[in-house]
Amino acid sequence: MSVEKRTPISVKEAIKRIMKQHVEVKNININLDESLGHILAEDIVATYDIPRFNKSPYDGFAIRSEDSQGASGENRIEFEVIDHIGAGSVSEKTIDKNQAIRIMTGAQIPSGADAVVMFEQTIESETTFTIRKSFKHLENISLQGEEIKAGDIVLHKGMRINSGVIAVLATYGYTKVRVARKPTVAVIATGSELLEVEDELEPGKIRNSNGPMIKALAKQFGIQVGMYKVQHDNLEKSIEVVKKALSEHDLVITTGGVSVGDFDYLPEIYKSIQAQILFNKVAQRPGSVTTVAFADGKYLFGLSGNPSACYTGFELYVKPAVNKLMGAKACYPQIIKATLMEDFNKANPFTRLIRAKATLTKAGMTVIPSGFNKSGAVVAIAHANAMIMLPGGTRGFKAGNIVDVILTESNSFEEELIL
């Protein structure tokens, strides 16, 4: 097999090439209690104000503010309590001069009242109370529509549904929600050196760790994963299984077979299914031979067989694509600044991604490499919740330097690519 010359592109350009492809986002209706983690497929318009009515934010007494004018420590003003209302109840009485209604948090302000006195601001007797300060018009009142007005867009298409979104949907009576259907992902590990997880070890062999790892990463999105048997280095069989996976799923991820060795068949597989190669080399370490193709409106990700490189490829390239397929408005990795806690002296001819442990402290975010830092590392991934991103063309970072970090355990994404 002839060795193909590959021209590397930047990480940013690689992500752009993935995201510019046109993909079909299919919408479905699901039950509200099944919608967590999905993406809204339509704007949600408020059908009424929030709050729906003027209400009390405190336990206290509803009064007319004009009756409190002139109150002081030397001139306490007395009010007669004529009713008592809790949240969900409405008083039928109208407050007159120096009258008050005992009111609980969330209850509707009764007719005639325009202020609320908190219990702790009063001295109570059996049917009366006194105050020593005056109150302004609408003091201590939550006003109708102060948060949302009827007709406002309260939730936007492309938002990820979290607990707060579910609260809003429930508020407006949505038992069914229009969402983007989550894609299904096929995972295929390749390589004659691979054994299944349950197999006994043999000389020169390793167990397939990438397949279960990719499955777990995909399931963090709550998407269905189809696992295919480990494919050994046989071109015809590999082509057959990739075609099958492509016909059964929305996205195909293979691990291994992306390098330039005699048994790395991915270029031939893509050629046989007439896939468009978006890129096959990225100026990054690890994972420089990450390859992404597009066929029949579907992505094919060829990730490295080295575990850390495979993990890096999923975080950088698969996640934005899955977000796009889910109809998300925010698709891109969230990058933050953190203080490096130990020296990293290795040269970085290309963008370097380091598995790391990020910690939020009182002084801010800190980050430290999580262990052995080579592309084949496995254990370092288990202790990582982040990736340090060091720019190409640099050499030597010292403890105390500020570095870019991707929080890999975060479910927050950016609308713009900020690499």
UniProtKB/Swiss-Prot annotation:
E.C. number: 2.10.1.1
Keyword Magnesium included in the entry's annotation: yes
Note accompanying the cofactor annotation: Binds 1 Mg(2+) ion per subunit.
EC category name: transferase
Cofactor list: Mg(2+)
Family named by the database record: Belongs to the MoeA family.
Protein's recorded name: Molybdopterin molybdenumtransferase
Native organism: Staphylococcus epidermidis (strain ATCC 35984 / DSM 28319 / BCRC 17069 / CCUG 31568 / BM 3577 / RP62A)
